[in-house]
Design a protein with these regions (language model features):
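Long, charged/polar, soluble alpha-helical segments
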Residues: 1-130
Length: 130
């Protein structure tokens, strides 16, 4: 059951990221944010299930992303996250659960960067409109 749910959640996150990239091309920021949140929620659920499956395994320092560059771009970051999730799905289907967990964890890091970007943008907009 857990394995089935992990695969469903990863697949759903991939699909939501696809929607977010389409919305980005259409310059529909609200839809980008909504889709990224949905992808993140599904990914967090998958990671929770991974943690239940492998309680003795903790994400290691080698799973962390390199420090972000000064120039952040949403599009390439979403593509990177989606690529990692596709790799996670492939690894999962090949029953390489450790690698699937690692790739999903790394994709999470990219999605957190996107969330941080939009949060900073909202704060900046809030200060300029006050």
């Amino acid at each position: 059951m857990k394995r089935e749910n992990i695969l469903e959640n990863i697949t759903s996150a991939i699909n939501y990221l696809e929607e977010s990239m389409k919305a980005l091309v259409e310059k529909n920021q609200k839809e980008v944010i909504r889709s990224v949140w949905r992808a993140s929620a599904d990914l967090e659920h998958a990671l929770f299930l991974f943690s239940l499956m492998h309680q003795d395994e903790n994400p290691s320092a080698s799973w962390k992303l390199s420090p972000s560059a000064k120039q952040f771009e949403v599009g390439p970051t979403l593509v990177e996250a989606q690529d990692l999730l596709k790799e996670a799905k492939d690894s999962f289907e090949a029953q390489n659960f450790h690698e699937a967990h690692k790739k999903a964890w790394m994709a999470r890091g990219y999605l957190l960067r996107v969330h941080d970007f939009f949060e900073k943008m909202w704060r900046k907009e809030g200060k300029t409109s006050s």
